[in-house]
Amino acid sequence: MGKFEVYVDASGKYRWRLKAVNGQVVATGGQGYATARSCREGIESVKKHSATAEIVEVEA
């Protein structure tokens, strides 16, 4: 099973990354969060909305 990791970056912001079973990073949060709690809320939002998200192709 994959896992979300919460960590603190060099500027002191909380960030998350999603790792696959093999340890490969497959997604990262696009922003830094001021608190660990707000970072976890960001993860929960991704989990909630990605379950029903469409896949759309966009042209460059």
Give the location of each predicted region.
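Short N-terminal "domain-start" leader segments
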Residues: M1-R15, K19-V21, A27-G29, S45-E59
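Amphipathic, hydrophobic secondary-structure cores in small proteins
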Residues: V25-Y33, S38, G42
